[in-house]
Amino acid sequence: MKLKLKNVFLAYFLVSIAGLLYALVQLGQPCDCLPPLRAAAEQLRQKDLRISQLQADLRRPPPVPAQPPEPEALPTIYVITPTYARLVQKAELVRLSQTLSLVPRLHWLLVEDAESPTPLVSGLLAASGLLFTHLAVLTPKAQRLREGEPGWVRPRGVEQRNKALDWLRGKGGAVGGEKDPPPPGTQGVVYFADDDNTYSRELFKEMRWTRGVSVWPVGLVGGLRFEGPQVQDGRVVGFHTAWEPNRPFPLDMAGFAVALPLLLAKPNAQFDATAPRGHLESSLLSHLVDPKDLEPRAANCTQVLVWHTRTEKPKMKQEEQLQRQGQGSDPAIEV
């Protein structure tokens, strides 16, 4: 048994010696290992280069995006708003003023249907932060709505809009805010914004560069989902309307804007209080432009950016009952 173990050990030793000698011989042989090593080194170099490029990109300041024109370079939008005393007047004017505050380079011409300015409107304008001109003119009694008459029987806001046009033409009359009219050569656009409508601020971007008279659809008006111009090949070819489609300009007051230089060049252009029902807009526009020269806006008049909304008249039954009992709401609190 001892002999066999000795023989096994000897054989293991000889085999190990032979393996060691073979390994030593192989170490001395030429090895073709350089190409793989060079390839690996090149990959590492490329990765290092890419990392350096990414680090440089992170340190580089971002490109400056194209900037819109500075407010001073924009034509001024003159927004003319007639208003009259009623329970919802302040609520309407607050909503409108906060929409207008989002629009750069805007001048608000707010015209009260009153003999003189009221504290409510004066205070609201002062707090609005807007550039404004405060005007006031009373609607003649013959033109006023009578008790129980629907609003569409007589045109409203005629005297007030014309008062604002007079101010733009240098005839004065301001009772608050900016007193001086725009100097000759001023580039701007005039828009008639009633205090009860709803306006997207995008609308003002659309009208700002008006050259003559620009137009667009108005939502929720004339018994339709919208009224507005029909456009073909970039030109107005008709009007989508249901009531008296043969009017010279079947447009809503909120559906157009006029370049200021055009208005100033036509001193007789104004609204006619005696115009037939529904023709108030036409009474002004007929002095200014031919229908074929209207400038379609709002994606060729396919977008609605203004809505002819109406605030519901508040029901004051409980207030009246408390007033009869001498317990009405505090009149010193402005609503």
UniProtKB/Swiss-Prot annotation:
Pathway in which the depicted protein is active: Protein modification; protein glycosylation
Record EC number: 2.4.1.135
Region described as Disordered: spans on this chain: 312-335
Segments on the Lumenal face: 29-335
Membrane topology, Cytoplasmic segments: 1-7
Tissues showing expression: Expressed in heart, aorta, bone, and also in osteoblasts.
Enzyme category, top tier: transferase
Cofactor(s) essential for the protein: Mn(2+)
Active-site residues from the entry: 281 (proton donor/acceptor)
Highest taxon in the source lineage: Eukaryota
Pfam families noted in UniProt: Glyco_transf_43
Keyword Disulfide bond belongs to the record: yes
Sequence intervals crossing the membrane: 8-28
Intracellular or extracellular location(s): Golgi apparatus membrane; Golgi apparatus, cis-Golgi network
PTM per Swiss-Prot/TrEMBL: N-glycosylated.
Phosphoprotein recorded as keyword: no
GO CC field: cis-Golgi network; Golgi apparatus; Golgi membrane
Biased segments, Basic and acidic residues type: 312-322
CDD domains to which the protein is assigned, alphabetical: GlcAT-I (cd00218)
Binding site for UDP-alpha-D-glucuronate: 82-84, 113, 156, 161, 194-196, 308-310
Family per similarity comment: Belongs to the glycosyltransferase 43 family.
Role: Glycosaminoglycans biosynthesis. Involved in forming the linkage tetrasaccharide present in heparan sulfate and chondroitin sulfate. Transfers a glucuronic acid moiety from the uridine diphosphate-glucuronic acid (UDP-GlcUA) to the common linkage region trisaccharide Gal-beta-1,3-Gal-beta-1,4-Xyl covalently bound to a Ser residue at the glycosaminylglycan attachment site of proteoglycans. Can also play a role in the biosynthesis of l2/HNK-1 carbohydrate epitope on glycoproteins.
Listed name of the protein: Galactosylgalactosylxylosylprotein 3-beta-glucuronosyltransferase 3
Encoding gene per record: B3gat3
